[in-house]
Amino acid sequence: MADDFAYLNARVRVRRGTLLKESFFQEALDLSFADFLRLLSETVYGGELAGQGLPDVDRAVLRTQAKLVGDLPRLVTGEAREAVRLLLLRNDLHNLQALLRAKATGRPFEEVLLLPGTLREEVWRQAYEAQDPAGMAQVLAVPGHPLARALRAVLRETQDLARVEALLAKRFFEDVAKAAKGLDQPALRDYLALEVDAENLRTAFKLQGSGLAPDAFFLKGGRFVDRVRFARLMEGDYAVLDELSGTPFSGLSGVRDLRALERGLRCVLLKEAKKGVQDPLGVGLVLAYVKEREWEAVRLRLLARRAYFGLPRAQVEEEVVCP
């Protein structure tokens, strides 16, 4: 194993060659479910496609991504491993938040979009099957995951789902920012600063009208969303988004609902992450690849559902295309 990115980036370049082309997604927008399965079987996901149902597609996507992304930290040592681990820990946070929402709404585990992180599917399933969020923290504590400690601390403060998610993100990004500062990886630090901005925008939307104190939820370390803007957006002042012109978030001007915000943030972060291909000697190339695979998983699941339920193209097209 190497302790720098030369070996890892060589492997990542090969794996980027298996990313699905844009033509795949354009074709899939008009296919029946049977034809979608046929098309998917001809890709890198075909090896894990072991059935003809929607859960089989989800399983194939999850397991293929675990193989093509989840093993990246094991291919390197030292600072390189730590940098990659921090990237995948971000997906662990997404997965935990998604499971908390699923448990609260009665959504089945199979419907949860899990992103490739540092934990196996089996661990997330056990966490979902826990009796309550405290039980989920206990499951995550077995492999010594840092989110276990964070979740326990948050649950001592509140049981409200929106607040739990926001406080989890706050604790997570504070810890990750400290770890990233110790690494000589400017591409990673710059990207994580954008993630902090994105999380602040997301949290402000979720907590609008709550009357909660902004300081309890505002994340430090962003580049464009300061505490004042965060507080204003929590109060419903959408002019904050207009003030982000000239930043990577300029496309959010005019957004007024959480779903549109999430879609816009996803595209912004993807675009910024893909700039990492210009960082062949650092973590940037891995960052680009991880986010490209993540976006691929989101698109595949949405397109599978469009085909399975016979939804019109227009209903999902804007969800699977980033300008």
UniProtKB/Swiss-Prot annotation:
Keywords: ATP synthesis, Hydrogen ion transport, Ion transport, Transport
Cited Gene3D superfamilies: ATP synthase (C/AC39) subunit, domain 3, V-type ATP synthase subunit C domain
Record's GO cellular component terms: proton-transporting V-type ATPase, V0 domain
Assigned protein family: Belongs to the V-ATPase V0D/AC39 subunit family.
GO biological process: proton motive force-driven plasma membrane ATP synthesis
Protein name per Swiss-Prot or TrEMBL: V-type ATP synthase subunit C
GO MF terms, alphabetically ordered: ATP binding; proton-transporting ATP synthase activity, rotational mechanism; proton-transporting ATPase activity, rotational mechanism
Biological role: Produces ATP from ADP in the presence of a proton gradient across the membrane.
